[in-house]
Amino acid sequence: MNIDVPLRELGPVDSAALSATILAQDAQAWKEDKYRQEAFEVHHATESIVMLFVDIERWPDIIVKQEPGWPRLADVALPLMNDIINRFYPPGGTVIRAMAAKLLAGGKITPHVDQHPSFRHGHRIHIPITT
């Protein structure tokens, strides 16, 4: 689904429960899954709590796996995800990635274009938790 613009603001969402849950996670939660940091140079200065991730080796087959962050965040993340999807997207899509990501103090994300074909077939929805 092409939205014909590089960025579209969807407006405010009630992220209070998700924010509180993410901010309450211990240091270990942010270190359970290092795949993104090890596989993608641009993510070295980040930590993630990954809930869902598509198997990029099997693309274009869409095989989505629940990751260690699922039991930590799903109860509060799913209602918010479903609300956004129901308000802004037609039925029939699949969430192929869901995570909380943290830029480490002093870290930088350099401008980049993600190369995997799955990024050309989906939209990213970012919900700022804290800045």
Residue ranges and their predicted role:
Residues 32, 36, 112-117, 123-125:
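General "foldedness" signal
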Residues 99-118:
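Conserved short histidine dyad/triad with adjacent acidic residue
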Residues 1-91:
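Non-heme Fe(II)/2-oxoglutarate
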Residues 94-96, 123:
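A generic structural signal for short beta-strands and their flanking turns/coil linkers
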Residues 21, 46, 94, 110, ...:
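Residue-identity detector for threonine
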